């Protein structure tokens, strides 16, 4: 009898399991399916129940789950992947720019730029209150600051506030009307600390020339007309549609407590500094939020542990909102690398200025801040572009790891210059490299605005994806949209080839496509703190997936770049399909 009871119990359990698994409401068969599960990366078929993955396997294994009520889709060999995840996207800012005047990093003559400004003034795309603003400006323009002044401080523009915003969103140029509105003049500049003076371009006589970077740009951004709540909700809806069309079903917003026009680089948050969080809440309440958003709160780089209480009061205002999580904080360790901004923090000085950029964090206390966040179970996501900023960011995380092994995954984003001594530190510190590898290109940015100004060693290890990977680092995909396109397939192809208009940017740092497929799925899910729910097609995880128009494992890099999404599914429901496919 003792042997009979276990046998009966096991049969009952098996029968119950079959019953539970027999209620698939959606089955997709005959596919080329990438699961992003390292234990079982490729399968033929997928079963979905109540918005979650029920099972994956062969056609034969999954067909037994089909009932009369089950919707069955024959993929006919098409490729299916998990929904893609962007580990660094300012999506609502991007949504605003979709409907606004934008140069898209294109360079044209000042005559043509002025012509476009007139056109955007007439159609309203450049108008924000009484200010004319154009986004997406190439950093190559900033060497012409004085020519901009001659053009846009007189004639028809003499009384019109104008701002040209860099595609990097760290730099801008403002005319005299706008500078006056922001209170920026020679007198102000002379009262600023030396580091902050360097964030405002100056003429020989000490007057501002209109060029702004980081904290200098904050001063002008703070007096720009604010977008209305309705405008922001429309921007969020546009961003959601656009991301879904690219196969993106989750992203991490790294500055969710800062709204457009609010200072970011010198942010001193209060419990009322809620940024775009109310917009995400409103979007969720419409029932149409077809993406997971992990919203980070920007902490001032010089914050102390007690300051986290203020951010926690913000977090508590936005709990239990479907598809919105608040997993941690974002910190700026430095600025940007390109000439003339050069605010990224370097180990060796810039060749022209002999300065080392601006390290925004305080190395003596940064570890205390990271450790305090880690103790709360918060992930820390750090903007670090220069090699010194990367080193000090790792040092801060190292302090947290010495204090405890929390299991919280922290990340460093951008990683434009990384000293080789840092490569082997990422894995043992459990730090993910959140990289915008679309930027790994031999172009005017890397060759004209960076190479002449940094050491040969620093330049050699620019966006060093392969070197990091070789030392065991985990890479997550990221775009920094609207700084550049959020299209993951563009970034995947670029990470492989590193080809640009001026050649190849250190071909040795190229990585393979499968690494990039994991970077935009399970690795990115870890980065944003949602790896238990999304990122791979495994039983119990949410059924977020995409179907694409080609076999991304076999096509060449050009074809990979041009991949189109045929449909995007969120929680087992189709949320995007082009008009015809």
Predicted regions and their residues:
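Bacterial N-terminal signal peptides that target proteins for export
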Residues: 1-8
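N-terminal signal peptide c-region/cleavage motif recognized by signal peptidases
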Residues: 17-19
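Active-site neighborhood of phospho(di)ester-bond hydrolases with catalytic His/Asp-centered motifs
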Residues: 81-87, 413-414, 434, 476-479
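Conserved beta-strand positions in the central sheet of alpha/beta enzyme cores
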Residues: 252, 330, 413, 434-435, ...
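Acidic (Asp/Glu)-rich catalytic clusters
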Residues: 283-287, 314-324, 426-428
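Short, conserved secondary-structure transition motifs
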Residues: 300-304, 413-422
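His/Asp/Glu-enriched, well-ordered alpha-helical/loop segment
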Residues: 371-381, 385-410, 420, 424, ...
């Amino acid at each position: 009898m003792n042997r009979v009871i276990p046998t009966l119990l096991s049969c009952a359990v098996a029968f119950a399991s079959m019953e539970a698994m027999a209620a698939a409401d959606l089955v997709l068969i005959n596919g080329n399916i990438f699961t992003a599960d390292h234990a079982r990366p490729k399968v033929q078929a997928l079963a979905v129940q109540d918005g979650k993955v029920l099972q994956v396997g062969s056609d034969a294994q999954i067909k037994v789950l089909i009932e009369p009520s089950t919707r069955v889709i024959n993929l006919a060999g098409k490729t299916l992947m998990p929904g893609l995840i962007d580990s660094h996207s300012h999506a609502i800012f991007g949504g605003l720019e979709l409907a606004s005047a934008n140069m898209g990093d294109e360079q044209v003559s000042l005559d043509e730029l002025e012509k476009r400004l007139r056109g955007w003034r007439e159609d309203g795309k450049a108008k924000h209150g009484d200010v004319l603003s154009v986004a997406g400006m190439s950093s190559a323009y900033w060497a012409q600051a004085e020519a901009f002044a001659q053009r846009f401080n007189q004639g028809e523009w003499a009384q019109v506030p104008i701002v040209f915003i860099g595609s990097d969103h760290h730099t801008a140029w403002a005319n005299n009307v706008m500078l006056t509105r922001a209170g920026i003049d020679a007198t102000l500049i002379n009262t600023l600390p030396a580091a902050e003076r360097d964030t405002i371009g100056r003429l020989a006589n000490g007057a501002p020339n209109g060029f702004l970077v980081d904290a200098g740009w904050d001063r002008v951004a703070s007096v720009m007309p604010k977008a209305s709540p309705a405008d922001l909700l429309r921007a969020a809806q546009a961003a959601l549609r656009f991301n879904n069309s690219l196969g993106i079903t989750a992203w991490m917003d790294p500055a969710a407590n800062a709204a457009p026009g609010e200072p970011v680089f010198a942010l001193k948050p209060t419990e009322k500094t809620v940024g775009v969080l109310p917009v995400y809440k409103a979007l969720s309440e419409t029932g149409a939020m077809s993406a997971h958003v992990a919203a980070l709160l920007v902490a001032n780089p010089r914050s102390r542990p007690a300051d986290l209480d203020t951010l926690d009061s913000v977090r508590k205002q936005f709990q239990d909102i479907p598809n919105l999580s608040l997993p941690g904080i974002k910190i700026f360790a430095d600025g940007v690398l390109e000439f003339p901004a050069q605010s990224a923090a370097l180990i060796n000085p810039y060749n022209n200025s002999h300065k080392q950029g601006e390290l925004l964090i305080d190395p003596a206390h940064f570890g205390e801040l990271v450790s305090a966040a880690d103790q709360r179970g918060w992930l820390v996501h750090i903007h670090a572009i220069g090699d010194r900023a990367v080193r000090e960011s790792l040092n801060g995380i190292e302090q947290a790891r010495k204090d405890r092994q929390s299991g919280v995954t922290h990340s460093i984003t951008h990683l434009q210059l990384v000293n080789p001594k840092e490569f082997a530190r990422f894995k043992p510190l459990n730090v993910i490299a959140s990289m915008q590898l679309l930027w790994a290109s031999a172009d005017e940015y890397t060759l004209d605005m960076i190479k002449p100004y940094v050491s040969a060693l620093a330049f050699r290890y620019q966006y060093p994806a392969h070197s990091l990977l070789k030392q065991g680092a985990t890479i997550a995909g990221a775009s920094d949209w609207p700084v550049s396109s959020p299209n993951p397939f563009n970034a995947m192809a670029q990470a492989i080839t590193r080809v640009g208009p001026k050649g190849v940017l250190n071909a040795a740092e190229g990585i393979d496509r499968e690494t990039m497929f994991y970077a935009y799925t399970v690795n990115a899910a870890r980065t944003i703190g949602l790896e238990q729910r999304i990122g791979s097609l495994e039983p119990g995880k949410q059924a977020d997936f995409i179907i694409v128009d080609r076999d991304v494992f076999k096509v060449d890099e050009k074809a990979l770049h041009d991949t189109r999404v045929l449909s995007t599914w969120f929680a087992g429901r189709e949320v995007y399909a082009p008009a015809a496919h």
